[in-house]
Amino acid sequence: MQRHVHRADLGERDPDYIRDYLPWLWLVASAWFRADVRGLENIPERGPALLVGNHSGGNMIPDTVILTMAFSTYFGAERPFYQLAHNLVLALPALAPLRRFGTVAATPENAAGALDAGAVLLVYPGGDHEVSRPVWQRNLIDFDGRRGFVRQALDAGVPLVPVVSIGGQETALFLSRGAGLARALRLDRTLRLKTLPISIAAPWGLNVGDFLGHVPLPAKITIQILPAIDLHERFGPDPDVDEVYEHVVALMQRTLDELAAERRLPVLG
């Protein structure tokens, strides 16, 4: 039986908590990952928007943490910003404070609720499929054909903002998604997990599932935020979902290729 995912309480996000912890968390992220976030000015200054990103780094989600810190530093903690994550990530004790930074379970209902409330929302269409891709695919945008983010933006009538990151998939040696193992253990039915990633990561060595998290390698992480897309202005009064999807993925892949060309060595950047 599939585990029920509850509708998020958007009030769990705590601007005072964010203001208290933001300076030193941003300092740690900047020092460990040499974080470089570009294009924050491309996020609309006010009102709701849907940020769509590629996802890397396993359950430790370094790209999410860095972008959340950068957003709150740039716009202020009072501007509502939410991030969708797998329910299992929110269950990890080490990541429980993310709720107070605005992380909520990835469901269409929670996404609609955040956008209806006028918030900026970050989604990762690739989810567990993309975040657990093997290291040799680290520079590949792979949403697994998931187009829900396009429909979400159209239904809410909000601009779509592509966000491209690089470096997160170098924080451990990801070897396999473990999709067959996840099916064999029926994790797709019990935990909504279609993957059981296999990696080599500190401090465990061989790491199956990443349920306890890991100590990420200090890979340089760069995040590029692209200009917002008004879907009706760009694609007409009745945008074709497939056309929008292909355009966004191609745009993000070109940007990821450009970011990859800047890097000289894995981890070091």
Model-found features: residue ranges?
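Non-catalytic C-terminal accessory region of glycerolipid acyltransferases
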Residues: 1-18, 113-269
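Membrane-anchoring hydrophobic helices of lipid-metabolizing enzymes
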Residues: 1-110, 178, 250, 257-269
